[in-house]
């Protein structure tokens, strides 16, 4: 909540439908390829967003995306997801179960900084899941007129994309 008054059009953030069925699969290798493609698309997308954030907003906001890129490049997390795929689960299920495990682990920590990393994992896994499902997620960098954001929740990456030139509240 911000103090003051802002007048602009409402930009209602509607969460994309990222629901899926938990499915057992038989073609493990093609499922791993799907996962790696989703990771690759997410990486390219985050590199572009990071570079734009760097140019428009500076190092601090770009650092959020650099952290997300590190998560995407974490061989331990990717390996844990691939183990679940090898156990016969579809990539979506493997991703969500692995992300949930990491999120719960970070949220249980005593260190506030580490607890905040749970939001980063949630954000990155949502991006990868959107690519697995072929669903577009919101991109605030495309806003080019004055707006007031109306949303239940904003992820770290969405918040970092907010351009105060156009976002009035």
Task: Mark where each language-model region is.
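Non-catalytic, soluble scaffold/interaction modules
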Residues: 1-169
């Amino acid at each position: 909540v911000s103090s003051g008054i802002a007048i602009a059009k409402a930009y209602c953030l509607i969460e994309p439908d990222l629901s899926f069925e938990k499915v057992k699969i038989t073609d493990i290798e093609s499922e791993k390829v799907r996962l790696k493609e989703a990771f690759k698309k997410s990486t390219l997308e985050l590199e572009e967003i990071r570079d734009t954030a760097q140019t428009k907003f500076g190092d601090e906001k770009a650092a959020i995306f650099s952290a997300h890129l590190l998560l995407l490049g974490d061989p331990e997390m990717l390996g844990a997801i691939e183990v679940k795929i090898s156990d016969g689960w579809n990539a979506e299920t493997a991703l969500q179960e692995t992300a949930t495990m990491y999120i719960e682990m970070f949220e249980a920590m005593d260190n506030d900084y580490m607890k905040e990393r749970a939001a980063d994992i949630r954000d990155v896994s949502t991006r990868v899941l959107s690519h697995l499902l072929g669903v577009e997620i919101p991109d605030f960098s495309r806003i080019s007129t004055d707006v007031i954001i109306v949303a239940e929740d904003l992820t770290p990456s969405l918040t970092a994309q907010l351009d105060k030139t156009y976002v009035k509240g």
